[in-house]
Amino acid sequence: MEKERRAADILAACCQGAAAAASPGAVLARMGEANRRQALEQVPGLQGLLCCVFPYFNRLDGGNLSLYARGMDYHLAARKRLDRACEALEKEFPGFQFRGYADVSPFPEVYACAWAGLGAIGKNGLLLTRRWGSYVFCGMIATDLPLEGGEEPQKCPDCGLCRRTCPGGALSQDGRLDQSRCLSALTQQKGELTLEQRRLIGRSGMAWGCDVCQRVCPANRGPEQTKIAEFLENIRSSLTAEELEGLTQREFRQKYGDRAFAWRGVVPLRRNLALLSQEKDSL
């Protein structure tokens, strides 16, 4: 397992979190035909996975933005580190190819990280790690370098707190998520919302996202703080309607384009802030 350890150490150093190697068989078996075909086309001769977590926990002070969206967009931060890791791995293992993924991926990244031994899968679908709880982003590198490793993912203790405290009742007993009732999904949704969905956002105090299921999770008692600079610097915990007033889509992108809350544009955020204001005025 020497090459597995060396490869994982390189990735862990780049992601400033944790990493582990695994064989791809069990992960590929869980994928649909289209995603499996895409993965094998992108990495011909796929024989190994290097899975990693990017911790993002900073602080739990007030605000109307979800914790994951307060620093730089994790896609940008993760991509930079994965590219750096791929370059280092290509030098360490010449002749092999390495391709990084973070969120935009044919692979089930949470399952892959759990299969690699980095944590358990919570009933809210998030990876539960020992050091950082669920305050992590999952990433991975697929390679034709033969790698061993992987074990049946640990099971969530199923205390039921996430299910019972979910504002919209989006989590079912068997761990399925109803997107139409998930506050985080609704704050990102474009187009019309039902009256109940609008009320859910208005009562939440959140302009983007929802951290309720994470805040109550026992795995998140005392998580370590991230060491990733992009998640520590230029933190923005809230947005106001005044800050968005009069901005065109282009101006909004120029001002907030490096933030995770910007990918859906300014319209959903304006709507959410208006719903928060309406709820406050009705009290």
Q: Which role does the model predict for each range below?
A:
Residues 1-155:
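Auxiliary alpha/beta "docking" domains used to position bulky ligands
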Residues 254, 262-280:
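Long, compositionally biased charged/polar accessory segments in the mid-to-C-terminal portions
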Residues 186, 190-208, 239-262:
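Short Fe-S-cluster ligation motifs
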